[in-house]
């Protein structure tokens, strides 16, 4: 089977991956309230972009389609970390959001304490999934190293800290870029780089640049989508800092740079990652 389009890839892989992830938590988490709270946010309608990017890179690096299920543990770990971050991000002490993806935020559904524990459970269960993976020790160690680096205090957590402690300060463009890189882009970069390592593909600067570019582009797209609803009026966003038109130009430049970077990648099927860029045209 040869798949050239990212959307087609997700259509074929996502149902099986979702079933795998649900079954893992259903069977491994015995405390019912904790399990319900974890699954509530995990199954809240996310697109699974990060694990799908991980699997797409593995597939593009030569992993056969029928063997992709061997990589579900690592893909699942990436999604668990992402979901934990959303639960904690919505807490009253953070962004204080009552809704996520059209549903009550976890803390509004279960309470603040259970929501914190649900996030804690997802984060720690992620590394259990990696440890139990059937992949070789060196690949599992690479996944732990990259994911903990990019999602922890040297990456995503640092970005979140900057976000909540600098709310009353207008950040410079460089500071805002660093914030978005850490808070949003680093986990996307992790998904792509772990995908390459897991498939035995030698990581290049071109693939890293692609990952960094689309990671920042993700945040710009979200900022633009939210620019008209008024909710981000007092937040550090690129539309607020440089204007909507210049943000759109910056987004277009990032997508162009990402395309040029992945086209330089050698010994790698570029089709899925090139077609993924259509996401930013929606």
Model-derived regions: residue spans:
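All-alpha prenyltransferase/terpene-synthase fold signal
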Residues: 1-282
